[in-house]
Amino acid sequence: MVYIMEIYTDGGCRGNGRPGAIGAAAAVVVKRNGKSTSWTRSLPRYPPPTNQRAEITAICLALELALEKFDQLDTNPQFDVTIYSDSKYAIGCMTTWIYKWARNGWFNAAGNQIANRDLIQEASDLDDRLDEVGNVKYVWIPREKNEVADRLCNEDMDDQ
């Protein structure tokens, strides 16, 4: 039996990278019947939130939700997770750059330490854990296909 999870993610920030900035991440799990369940997470004030930190936080949230779901299952099915994001940065981090950065000691091609290393390493660790129990795929989608997660981020930031 195959258990399939589809999770739409988004992150947003107001005041990107400046003192007083606020940020939020959202993950929306879409079920086979078309219904969805959603979660949001406000970003901490330090380090100052950025759009990129919010997008990677959303990926971490999705990976955490997938691992929690797997732990709740009574059986050990083949577990296939697809994480959708409208962030080319987040998708690039998880599908390409993360492997190069890890090999280079978390430095980029210019020899500088990569930005958001803490969150990217956290996402990498969660991805590794999920790979032990199933498959995870990251898919870029256009912004207009991600309206629910985007709205949830904005609502979270409105409440901060």
Give the ranges of each region predicted by the language model.
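RNase H catalytic domain
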Residues: N16, L61-C153
